[in-house]
From Swiss-Prot:
Keywords: Ribonucleoprotein, Ribosomal protein, RNA-binding, rRNA-binding
Function: One of the early assembly proteins it binds 23S rRNA. One of the proteins that surrounds the polypeptide exit tunnel on the outside of the ribosome. Forms the main docking site for trigger factor binding to the ribosome.
Assembly information from the UniProt record: Part of the 50S ribosomal subunit. Contacts protein L29, and trigger factor when it is bound to the ribosome.
Record-level GO BP terms: translation
HAMAP family on file: Ribosomal_uL23_B
UniProt keyword Ribonucleoprotein present: yes
GO cellular component: ribonucleoprotein complex; ribosome
Record bears the keyword Aminoacyl-tRNA synthetase: no
Family, as annotated: Belongs to the universal ribosomal protein uL23 family.
Protein name per the record: Large ribosomal subunit protein uL23
UniProt xrefs under PROSITE patterns: RIBOSOMAL_L23
Molecular function via GO: rRNA binding; structural constituent of ribosome
C-alpha cells in the first residue's frame, strides 16, 4: 500500500522532549497526531511513511489550556499524542537535521 494524503494528515509532527528522548531507548517514538485519528490509522501511517513494523500504539489527549487575553476568556486547542512502539531492532531517527 502506498503512502496517501491521509497518512500525511494523520502524523502531524514528532514530539521531541527529554522524556521522549528517554522513551526512544525503549523503541518508542512520540508523534503529535490528528485528533480524529484512530490507533489503527496511526499504526498504518507510521508503517507506510517510515517503513518500520509497529507493535503497539498508545494515545493521549491533552486538553487545551484556558487563557485570558484582555479580559476575554479563550481556550487553546486539544492535542492528541501517540506513543508508537516499534518492533525489536527497528528505529526511526527523528532528531536528524535539528
Amino acid at each position: 500500500m502506498a503512502a496517501t494524503a491521509r497518512h500525511y494528515d494523520t502524523i502531524l509532527s514528532p514530539v521531541i522532549t527529554e522524556k521522549t528522548t528517554l522513551l526512544s531507548e525503549q523503541n518508542k517514538v512520540v508523534f503529535k497526531v490528528a485528533n480524529d485519528a484512530t490507533k489503527d490509522e496511526i499504526a498504518a501511517a507510521v508503517e507506510e511513511l517510515f517503513k518500520v513494523k509497529v507493535t503497539k500504539v498508545n494515545t493521549i489527549v491533552t486538553k487545551g489550556k484556558t487563557k485570558r487575553f484582555r479580559g476575554i476568556v479563550g481556550r487553546r486547542n486539544d492535542v492528541k499524542k501517540a506513543i508508537v512502539t516499534l518492533a525489536e531492532g527497528q528505529s526511526i531517527d527523528i532528531t536528524t537535521g535539528l
